[in-house]
A protein has these predicted regions:
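Short helical segment in ABC ATPase nucleotide-binding domains corresponding to the A-loop/adjacent helical element
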Residues: 95-103, 113, 221
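Conserved ABC transporter NBD signature motif
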Residues: 62-74
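The feature captures the beta-strand-to-loop junction immediately N-terminal to the Walker
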Residues: 39-41
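Conserved signature/switch motifs of ABC ATPase nucleotide-binding domains
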Residues: 131-134, 152
Length: 255
C-alpha cells in the first residue's frame, strides 16, 4: 500500500531579479513501512524535496499525499524529522529533550517519563535520562535525537544526512540501530544522503536524482538478499559491490 505519494512536484526559488527552478515534475510513491533513500549530485533538490514532504513550505506546483490525504497542518504530526545536527536543548536533561515534542503537542504528561525511559532503553542509552547533552558523545546525542523523534509516534521519518557528522565507527553503529528500530516500530522512512554505500546498506529502494533542475532520474531496487541483512553486514556481502558500481556509474553519467 502506498503511504506517501508525490504528484507533479515543481519548485522554484524567487528573488527580485530571477527565478531558479530546483525541482521539476517529481512523481513517486513510497509504500507503508518502506525505507528508501534519495541520492544525487549537489543541486538536485533532495533536501528541498524533503522539506516539502515535511510540510515546512509548499511546492510551487504539485501535491503531496500522506496516508491518502494532502499534507496539511492537521496531519503533519504523522511526520518525524531527524537532521545532521541533533538540536538538543543544552539546558534541558536528556529525558526532557526526548519528551519535548509530547509537551508541545500537549500529550498526557503522566506518561512522559515512562515514554522517555522506554525509548532511551530502545536506543541503547538506558541510564542517561538525567544527563545533559554536553555529557554525551556525538553518536549518543544522535541516538537521543532518534528517541525524541520516535516519542511522538510519527508514521514516517525523514532523515536528512543524520550520520554525516559522525566518525565512521559511530556512523556504522547508528545505521544498524536506526534500521533495526524503524523495522521494529514499522515506520516508513526516507534518508537523504550523499553516501551511496549508506543508501544501499539501509534501503529497500534508492531514488537517484539529477540536478539543475532536480528531476527523478532512476530508481534502483535493492536485492532482497541485502534487504534481509543489517547495514554493517550488507557491506560484506558480495552483491553489495555490484550494486554500488551500478549506482555509481549511473551517478557519474549525470556529469
Amino acid at each position: 500500500m502506498d503511504f506517501l505519494k508525490l504528484e507533479h512536484i515543481h519548485h522554484s526559488y524567487y528573488s527580485s531579479t530571477q527565478a531558479k527552478e530546483v525541482l521539476r515534475d517529481i512523481n513517486l510513491d513510497i509504500r507503508e513501512g518502506e525505507f528508501v533513500s534519495f541520492i544525487g549530485p549537489s543541486g538536485c533538490g533532495k533536501t528541498t524535496l524533503l522539506s516539502i514532504i515535511a510540510g515546512l513550505f509548499p511546492a510551487t506546483e504539485g501535491k503531496v499525499f500522506i496516508d491518502g490525504e494532502i499534507i496539511a497542518p492537521h496531519n503533519q504530526s504523522l511526520i518525524g524529522y531527524m537532521l545532521q545536527q541533533d538540536y538538543l536543548f543544552p539546558w534541558k536533561t536528556i529525558e526532557d529533550n526526548v519528551t519535548i515534542g509530547l509537551k508541545i503537542m500537549q500529550r498526557d504528561n503522566k506518561t512522559h517519563k515512562v515514554t522517555a525511559n522506554a525509548l532511551l532503553q530502545e536506543v541503547g542509552l538506558p541510564h542517561v535520562g538525567s544527563y545533559y547533552p554536553r555529557e554525551l558523545s556525538g553518536g549518543m546525542r544522535q541516538r537521543v535525537a532518534l528517541a525524541r523523534t520516535l516519542a511522538v509516534n510519527p508514521k514516517i521519518l525523514l532523515l536528512d544526512e543524520p550520520f554525516s557528522a559522525l566518525d565512521y565507527q559511530s556512523k556504522l553503529k547508528l545505521e544498524d540501530l536506526v534500521v533495526e528500530t524503524l523495522k521494529a516500530y514499522q515506520k516508513t522512512a526516507i534518508l537523504v544522503t550523499h553516501d551511496i554505500g549508506e543508501a544501499i546498506a539501509m534501503s529497500e529502494r534508492v531514488f537517484l536524482f539529477s540536478a539543475n533542475p532536480g528531476t527523478l532520474h532512476k530508481v534502483f531496487e535493492i536485492p532482497s538478499a541485502l534487504q534481509q541483512l543489517s547495514p554493517f553486514d550488507v557491506r560484506q556481502h558480495p552483491v553489495y559491490s555490484e550494486v554500488f558500481q551500478t549506482i555509481w556509474k549511473e551517478l557519474e553519467s549525470l556529469g
